[in-house]
């Protein structure tokens, strides 16, 4: 059944009401991240500028997101069903390369940090499938959505979003520039209200079969994009609504708005760092009291007794005492500063860190209270367990996203497309026709091979596995995260070893035998920048082989070093016409 404007307004009202609690929490988190604590805790402010304690909430969010995002996902595609094994494997390899190309086109490596921030801070990473509609052969890609703009309406039993809204406040001039000044929506609102407002709601609606875009009345005024403003209820009297794009079938295998709700005890959308806020609020409030106490102590008024001209008190003043038995007295009765309260502030900051498994060492404080390595291991273990939780959820979210991208590629792309990139460290270039290639099979599995570890720990684990013989050098390079093209790097490492053997062993031996010409030619080729060391080495080796092959059969054997023999044999055996060292030429010919 096609969505109507009245149905959209009903869903809009429901979405705003049902997501109100989570949007309030998102607003609070945004303001704490921006150090606008006076908007969150207005009764605990000394100044209107900055918090009084360390913003461990921001530190934890950025550190945890960066650590989790440092490990890139693995994309695995099973063989196609009902195909010969060789053809199925070939199609699976091409499917994987297409998925890799879609990930690169979505800038997933840079977007991943933002997705993890949304997971830790808001508990709702979200994206939308989109493409450049002016280019028929353009590749679809993921657009990361701000969680405060996403309003889930219905979820599937497996946790996928079935229906949702994207609600954003936008300027009228921007909407006209994007949708065109002749769009019927603007004409309809102008006729119904007699004017156009400065700000409007842009509402994207989507379910599993259709999507559409509408415009509606919004609170007026300009706020920063990070400040959440509750949308006007669509059911209020006088609200103006119209379709910017009429609802139409999107032909995808699910809702084009993609979101993943982080598991919580009460089923609400909430960030994993929310437990930090109560102790952080106490630390902030207590530190304000300590600051006020210190300020009173610094600016305490002097106490002047039995002084005749007390009103002249000040710099370089001469004071006269009152005659009588009492002595003149000038005192500074400052209240004692409660410095022990600073320890309570630190305790609350530590409680905020501990509530989300964020050791103080991660924030740059080495700490002096760690008595043993076991304590450090336990702290890091709690940190890593939450990282593993985030990566598991992100793998599930990515799997849904890539399946949706594959369907969009089949349904929305016209003609063939060339793709290129790196697959398991190997550069590739392929051409395929999306409408004929997918055939409704969008199966893909996204995983993280190093759950709960950061890039440094992952590198240490890969190195240890390589030393123990559990991994080949190429696989270790791929899992290290440092080598973009393991196949090319493996070749470079091998050639580097050969060049080192040439320079350190073969050339010195040839010079000792009196062959200084090869030595001179090698370094002249390098010094002139005409050849790389590897190319110069290969050229001179080829020259040596040709000289040996041109010698008559009864000539004395050439002076070939064991090192050169080893290098040549490793390249595919002895050159034709070159007898082994120590064997007469006649015997070699028999």
Stretch-by-stretch model annotation:
Residues 1-193, 347, 380, 396, ...:
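Extended, helix-rich architectural segments
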Residues 2-8, 12-14, 303-590:
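C-terminal anchoring/interaction modules
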């Amino acid at each position: 059944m096609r969505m109507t404007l009245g149905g959209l307004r009903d869903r809009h009202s429901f979405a705003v009401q049902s997501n109100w609690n989570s949007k309030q929490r998102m607003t609070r988190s945004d303001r704490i991240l921006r150090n606008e604590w006076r908007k969150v805790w207005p009764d605990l402010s000394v100044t209107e500028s900055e918090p009084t304690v360390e913003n461990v909430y921001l530190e934890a969010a950025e550190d945890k997101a960066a650590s989790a995002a440092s490990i890139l996902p693995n994309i695995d595609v099973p063989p196609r069903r009902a195909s010969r094994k060789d053809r199925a494997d070939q199609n699976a390899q091409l499917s994987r390369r297409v998925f890799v190309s879609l990930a690169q086109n979505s800038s997933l490596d840079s977007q991943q940090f933002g997705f993890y921030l949304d997971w830790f801070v808001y508990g709702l990473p979200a994206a939308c499938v989109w493409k450049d509609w002016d280019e028929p052969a353009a590749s679809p890609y993921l657009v990361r959505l701000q969680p405060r703009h996403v309003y889930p309406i219905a979820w599937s039993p497996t946790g996928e979003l079935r229906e949702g809204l994207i609600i954003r406040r936008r300027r009228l001039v921007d909407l006209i520039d994007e949708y065109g000044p002749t769009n019927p929506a603007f004409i309809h609102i102008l006729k119904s209200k007699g004017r156009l407002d400065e700000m409007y709601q842009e509402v994207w609606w989507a379910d599993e079969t259709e999507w559409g875009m509408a415009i509606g009345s919004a609170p007026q005024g300009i706020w920063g994009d990070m400040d959440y403003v509750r949308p006007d209820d669509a059911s209020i009297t006088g609200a103006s609504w119209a379709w910017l794009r009429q609802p139409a079938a999107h032909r995808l295998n699910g809702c084009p708005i993609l979101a993943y709700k982080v598991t919580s005890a009460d089923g609400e959308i909430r960030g994993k760092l929310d437990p930090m806020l109560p102790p952080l609020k106490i630390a902030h409030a207590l530190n304000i009291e300590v600051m006020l106490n210190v300020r009173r102590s610094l600016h305490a008024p002097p106490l002047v007794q039995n002084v005749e001209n007390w009103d002249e008190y000040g710099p370089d003043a001469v004071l006269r005492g009152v005659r009588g038995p009492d002595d003149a007295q000038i005192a500074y009765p400052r209240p004692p500063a409660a410095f022990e309260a600073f320890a309570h502030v630190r305790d609350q900051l530590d409680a905020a860190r501990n509530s989300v498994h964020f050791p103080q060492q991660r924030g740059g404080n080495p700490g002096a209270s760690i008595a043993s390595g076991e304590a450090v291991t336990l702290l890091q273990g709690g940190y890593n367990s939450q990282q593993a939780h985030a990566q598991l959820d992100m793998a599930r979210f990515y799997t849904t996203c890539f399946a949706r991208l594959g369907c969009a590629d089949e349904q929305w792309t016209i003609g063939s497309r060339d793709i290129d990139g790196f697959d398991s460290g190997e550069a590739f270039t392929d051409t395929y026709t999306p409408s004929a290639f997918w055939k409704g099979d969008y199966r893909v599995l996204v995983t993280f091979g190093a759950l709960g570890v950061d890039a440094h720990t992952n590198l240490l684990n890969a190195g240890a596995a390589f030393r123990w013989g559990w991994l080949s050098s190429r696989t270790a390079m791929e899992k290290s995260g440092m080598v973009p093209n393991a196949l090319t790097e493996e070749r470079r490492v091998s050639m580097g070893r050969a060049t080192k053997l040439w320079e350190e062993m073969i050339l010195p031996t040839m010079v000792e035998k009196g062959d200084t010409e090869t030595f001179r030619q090698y370094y002249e080729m390098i010094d002139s920048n005409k050849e790389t060391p590897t190319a110069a080495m290969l050229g001179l080796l080829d020259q040596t082989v040709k000289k040996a092959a041109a010698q008559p059969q009864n000539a004395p054997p050439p002076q070939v070093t064991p090192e050169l023999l080893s290098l040549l044999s490793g390249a595919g055996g002895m050159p034709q016409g070159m007898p082994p060292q120590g064997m007469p030429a006649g015997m070699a010919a028999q």
